[in-house]
Amino acid sequence: INMSDTIAVMNHGRFEQIGTPDEIYNHPKTSYVATFVGNANILKGVVKEPADNNNHQITIITESGEVQVLAASEENMPQPGETVTIAVRSENIRFEESVNNIQGNSTGNIHGLTAKVTEKTFAGGQLRVVLKTTDGQEIIASRYGIDTNVNVGETVRCCFKPSDAVLVDRPEANAETNTQKAQRDNQSTTGGTHA
């Protein structure tokens, strides 16, 4: 991936996404692409209400808590009540180390997922923490350095910045591919395009 300027990710003989390494890693269009390159946590939830339409920030309710994410554009903004899927890279997960000590933000709301630490593994300078949310979903967090003060069996709050979460599996994600396919199909049946 670090030697390529364009990458095509295929799934069962179909292109999932074509883009630069940065686009593939940081802005995956589908959950398949998000998990194909690197470690990504895939979460599902229901859109509550857009928190701020000016910056495309929305609040999503999961069974383990509320999280905030940014939609890429106004056109990509899901509607309240819509079920959505988000991807969050393992290195972007942060911890509130004790749910008893969590303070709400300026509005008194606490955003994040409540989860129990089930595994803590050191690999050189990296710490890998596996957690299980209250609804049974596994979350993986990767931290560099050994200063993360969480212990196996402890319940913590998993948090991330809205800008670190990506909406995936949106209907618009494959719109260009479908248009291109229709054009190719049209060319093959008509012998080309006409102006």
Language-model features and meaning:
Residues 22-26, 34-37:
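Short acidic-hydrophobic catalytic motif
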Residues 9-10, 88:
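Catalytic metal- and UDP-sugar-binding loop of GT-A-like glycosyltransferases, i.e.
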Residues 40, 50-195:
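Non-catalytic connector elements of ABC transporters
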Residues 1-4, 36:
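Hydrophobic Walker B segment
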Residues 6, 18, 27:
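Short, glycine/charged-rich "phosphate-handling" switch motifs in NTP-dependent
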Residues 20, 32, 46, 114-117:
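Residues located in well-ordered beta-strands
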